[in-house]
Amino acid sequence: MSRGLGDVYKRQMLLMGCGQTSVPDEIADSSEKKESSVEPEKNGEEPVLQKVTLNEVAHSIFYAPMYVAIEEGYFKDAGIDLDLVTGFGADKVMTAVLSGEADIGFMGPETTVYTANEGSKDPVINFAQLTQRAGNFLVAREEMNDFKWSDLIGEDVLGGRAGGMPEMVFEYILKQNGIEPSEVNIDQSIDFGSTGAAFTGGQGAYTVEFEPGATLLEQEKAGYVVASLGVDSGYVPYTAFSAKQSYMKKHPDVIQAFTNALQQGMEYVNTHTPEEIAASIQTQFSETDTATITTIIRRYQKQDTWKRDLVFSEDSFTLLLDILESAGQLEKRPDYQDVVTTEYAEKALQ
């Protein structure tokens, strides 16, 4: 691996994995706040903050609304002292939620479907959907202005782990274009956080990359984005927030306050420029410059990545099950109400 390409991988891993593990004590607020404190201020005293541990599947600009809610102080104003931990994989996030190590998980909702089908007595329920498109891109070694999905037939592609949303959405797109996944040599042995290193090391003719990996590869002339999985797959419930049913019953006020803060983050990214959003979340991605963050946000905004609200609709859930079924990863189709609630997201809009 050349020094330059090695730097690409190091930068990618730092940007995807080095999230803050706690919220700064003082964060300036520049937007209107919802009155949603968990424990209101009394007699002019500072409100008591509720500690909440959130385990995220990865640390990526793809999840900008959440980081805006942190950096603009929305969680703190909602009465929440947020401890953000990066789990590096949906399976690890789910393990943290089930064990009680995390109060809330942020991951692909397919993981909650798997858990429900295993017959969990304390199911993990999705209560807020953040992204409505896939956040990854197909990267080739050379520029391809006239790329067609059929170009992948017979080629080596670094995909993602079997059963994960990146891999399943990729296979879904292939099938939508009349291509059987077996016609493509898909490497499912590499974790999505390591595909960039494998690609720069010479593996694969193509790789499926999240941001900032895709942009970093382009900046170093090591790869070129030829297709957006988010655009070509259509609207997909890619990532959502979830918690154990028992936690939600015990702390409905915390879940509501958390959702209210997230909704403010959603409204921010949908009403501000890429430059303004980049400036807001810069400290979450200190290993990269604001210009690069802006480029990535503009790419995500252009493809309508973020919802206007956090409501996880039944239509979206049905599409998720269809994708899982198409990938051969669904034993049975759980009922919508068993793994999704829209109560908190709908109230956050009021």
Feature names for model-found ranges:
Residues 27-29, 33-35, 39-179, 186-189, ...:
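Short, glycine-/small- and polar/acidic-enriched structural segments
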Residues 14-17:
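C-terminal motif of bacterial Sec signal peptides marking the signal peptidase cleavage site
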Residues 111, 142, 193-285:
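Pocket-lining segment of extracytoplasmic ligand-binding domains
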Residues 1-12:
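Single conserved hydrophobic/aromatic residue that forms the stacking wall/gate
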Residues 77, 150, 231-233, 303-312:
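Short, solvent-exposed loop/beta-turn-alpha elements that line the ligand-binding surface or hinge
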Residues 19-21:
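Bacterial signal peptide processing site
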Residues 318-350:
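Conserved C-terminal helix/tail region of periplasmic/extracytoplasmic solute-binding proteins
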Residues 249-331:
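Secondary-structure end/capping motifs
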